[in-house]
């Protein structure tokens, strides 16, 4: 059942060529992560026709069905060839007998195709984080362990502590004035750092920026482990559109 990206592309092309005799064939990409489900529908020229994502709250099949319904509502009945990726996708792929592409393979292939100048990719997921180095055709991946410190779940926990969400945390962080040291390796340790600061009157703006800085520190120390982040850097994953990417960029080298 495990497929490489090349195998998936070859099977998709073969299937699509066969189906083109009757109708157009579209590709459906499904990414099932630890906290969200993402789908994208592309035509035979790699143009996006539909894309969306939702948090699944452990209801993966129901969430996927909802997203597929939205796609059908927009595009109508179409012939598709699906491929599944993501940390939570293998079981569903086996159950549905759908090709599965390991997420690092999928990410690396996508970047080498659509952003070939990428030297380093930093991806923060719901419960995992990874750095991918592209060096002379070689791909080196570094991933966090079993702890979700410094990931999207960590940001959600910290946002809840400040009675907001990740987007609200981002808005607060835009106006920070001071930065505090907060541990990101563990949500429990981070809470013990933040609660005294709250009691002492630290602003939500400063705490929010400090939380994002903690994520950066965890990425640098826990994943890069001293290896330089230089050149063209791609930021991937749900948490990175918020302030963390802006704080992280100064750590990369030209």
Report residues per predicted region.
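Adenine-nucleotide phosphate-binding core of ATP-dependent small-molecule kinases
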Residues: 190-222
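Glycine-rich phosphate-binding loop plus the immediately following alpha-helix
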Residues: 60, 137-178
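A short acidic Gly-Thr/Ser loop motif
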Residues: 31-35, 86-87, 124-128, 151, ...
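Glycine-rich phosphate-binding loops at beta-strand->alpha-helix junctions
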Residues: 88, 224-254
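Short glycine-rich, Thr/Ser-proximal phosphate-binding strand/loop in the N-terminal lobe
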Residues: 26-62, 66-69, 140-141, 145
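Phosphate/pyrophosphate-binding loops at sites that engage ATP/ADP/AMP, CoA/4′-phosphopantetheine
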Residues: 67-80, 219-231
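Gly/Thr-rich phosphate-binding beta-strand-loop-beta motif of the actin/hexokinase/Hsp70
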Residues: 23-45, 118-135
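Short beta-strand-loop/turn "lid" adjacent to the catalytic site in phosphate-handling enzymes
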Residues: 46, 53-56, 71-105, 133-141
